[in-house]
């Protein structure tokens, strides 16, 4: 049995902030992580998304300059595999600098690789070892909530995590939902040449935001070329030889 002052479940930004503060106050800390050190932000969230979005923005700007006579930039092209490779290198570097090296710099912080299970209020089982903490911090974060659309479980769907791990760019993509992550991903893939359709069940995208702002953003994205369908409900999802078919219903019509 190993005993610590503080035991923290997972190792994302919140977990590390808690671990460092506890160590600075003189506590011994154990962080339990079943997957990759660093959590969502550095591995599959903020860092990789902003890196790829910045690349898409730059490519979009270069392509837009073609409408000016007298400006020549050669044949701009997207090498998706190389973009993904440099994104992964950035993630690996930041994970090491901002998380692994930081933890190793504190003698009071230990990282236990494995899945933790509570066996009492202060005892957690990790890899058949019991870890005890006077205080336990649960910093497990969140994961994508998969809607129960008929047929969805039988198709090869993506979450935002898998979207950034694609080995090749798809010809087309349907994004269900019109929230912030859906829009930034949709615009990014569109700028890389993917035909993107966004399905939003509400009357406009960004349903939790000011309507005037949301509609302005919707107009901008549609002018850029994204296909956005609002007041649209998904009724069925199915796999086909050419990809995934999504059947939808709107107030006016039903279509695939």
Region spans (language model):
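Glycine-rich flavin
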Residues: 2-3, 20-27, 32-169, 202-206, ...
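N-terminal Rossmann-like FAD-binding beta1-loop-alpha1 element of flavoenzymes
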Residues: 4-31, 175, 181-191
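Residue-level marker of alpha-helix boundaries and capping positions
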Residues: 9, 90-91, 176, 208
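Generic alpha-helical hydrophobic packing signal
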Residues: 11, 23, 123, 133, ...
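Glycine-centered short loops/turns at secondary-structure junctions
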Residues: 26, 193-195, 225
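Short beta-strands and strand-loop turn motifs
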Residues: 81, 198-202, 229-231
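Rossmann-like NAD(P)H-binding beta-loop-alpha module
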Residues: 156, 167-201, 208-209
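Internal, well-ordered alpha-helical segments in soluble enzyme and binding-protein domains
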Residues: 181, 185, 213, 217, ...
């Amino acid at each position: 049995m190993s005993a610590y002052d503080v035991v923290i479940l997972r190792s994302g930004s919140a977990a590390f902030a808690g671990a460092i503060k506890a160590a600075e106050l003189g506590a011994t800390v154990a962080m339990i992580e079943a997957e990759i050190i660093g959590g969502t932000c550095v591995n599959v969230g903020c860092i990789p998304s902003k890196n790829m979005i910045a690349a898409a923005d730059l490519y979009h700007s270069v392509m837009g300059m073609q409408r000016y006579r007298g400006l020549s930039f050669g044949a701009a092209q997207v090498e998706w595999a190389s973009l993904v490779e440099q994104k992964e290198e950035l993630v690996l570097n930041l994970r090491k600098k901002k998380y692994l090296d930081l933890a190793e710099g504190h003698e009071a912080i230990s990282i236990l690789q494995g899945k933790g299970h509570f066996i009492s209020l202060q005892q957690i089982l990790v890899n058949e070892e019991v870890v005890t903490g006077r205080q336990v911090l649960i910093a497990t974060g969140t994961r994508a909530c998969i809607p129960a659309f008929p047929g969805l479980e039988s198709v090869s769907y993506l979450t935002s995590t898998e979207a950034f791990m694609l080995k090749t760019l798809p010809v087309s993509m349907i994004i269900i939902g019109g929230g912030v992550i859906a829009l930034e991903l949709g615009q990014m893939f569109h700028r890389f040449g993917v035909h993107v359709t966004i399905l939003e069940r509400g009357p406009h995208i960004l349903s939790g935001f000011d309507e005037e702002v949301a509609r302005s953003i919707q107009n901008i994205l549609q002018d850029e070329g994204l296909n956005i369908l609002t007041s649209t409900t998904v009724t069925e999802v199915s796999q086909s030889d050419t990809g995934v078919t999504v059947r939808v219903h709107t107030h006016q019509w039903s279509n695939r």
